[in-house]
Amino acid sequence: QNPIEFNKIKNIYNAKLVRYLFDTEKYQSEEDYREIFFQEYLDGKIDKNEYYNAENSFKEFIKYLSRISNVYVCYDFLASIENSYPFQNSSDVNFSLDFIKETQGKFTKIIDKFQLEQVSILFAREIVCGFIVLDDIKSVVICSGMHGCILSVNDLDSELLSAISLQVKVEKISALQN
């Protein structure tokens, strides 16, 4: 996780919350770490399969969470969708413009698979930034592309951690660090 993002999360949110970092990039050491961005795929800097494997892992991660909890989202566009290069180059996705424009900036319950798929891709491709609330497990997923932080009232149980670690690298932050 980017240290600046981590410190921002640390300073904004309640210190009593349990924190987990997640990332679709499953690297062995910090030297091996390389973030995967849709923009890099569009620019030809990463392989199509590498990008889509990471995006599919992220979507499966969100889909799994939606099976164990109600899902609410709140997001804002990083740039207007008319000017968003990643959005304009997402012709492989059948977005409902009415849905994504209506829900932008609003706390919205996701009620079907189509909405969940769209929201997952908006986050994965860094078209939006925001958070996903999982009320049944009292947790919030803060996304920055296909990585971010899970803030939880309680420790996530080992079965849940095991299931989501099949899709993303997940690591508990044991103590607040500078």
For the regions a language model picked out, list residue spans one by one:
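Structured alpha/beta or helical-core interaction and ligand-binding surfaces enriched in interleaved
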Residues: 1-149, 154-178
